[in-house]
Amino acid sequence: MQNFGIFFNPNYERTEPIFNLLKKLHKNKDLQFYNFPQQKELFPDFIKSIEKNKLDCILSFGGDGTFLRASKLSLEFDVPLMGINLGKLGFLSESSLSELEKSIDDLKKNKFKRS
């Protein structure tokens, strides 16, 4: 897996650490990140516009509501969805921002289950 769609809660204000980490992963691990049209204006330039045939997985940054909204995109693009919890409590998210790099490594090694 090299190509990740990025979907996040547009009301989340502390996006700089997220984008800094994604930029590091883009540069160091040769990962590509894509935005969705409904959130295009929220992203820095290194995150490209979505290319449907290139997407391997969607990363949802936020809470359970954001994850549920992103699940529609996961079905539309027929790719797995991984939730990155940005709050204190997230029942549907499998990872946190501090675990993101390891979680992506696990995805690349096919160490995940689709449910």
Indicate residue ranges for each PLM-predicted region.
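Glycine-centered flexibility sites
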Residues: 5, 62-65, 83, 87-90, ...
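N-terminal glycine-/serine-/threonine-rich phosphate-binding loop
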Residues: 1-62, 66-76
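Gly/Ser-rich helix-loop-strand patches that form or flank binding pockets
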Residues: 69, 73-87, 91
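Short, glycine/serine-rich, charged loops/turns that create anion-binding
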Residues: 11-12, 86, 96
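Catalytic core of DAGKc-family lipid kinases
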Residues: 91-115
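Residue-level signature of transmembrane alpha-helix interfaces in integral membrane proteins
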Residues: 19-21, 25, 78-79, 99-106
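Glycine-rich loops and low-complexity Gly/Arg-rich segments
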Residues: 29-33, 59, 84-86, 106-110
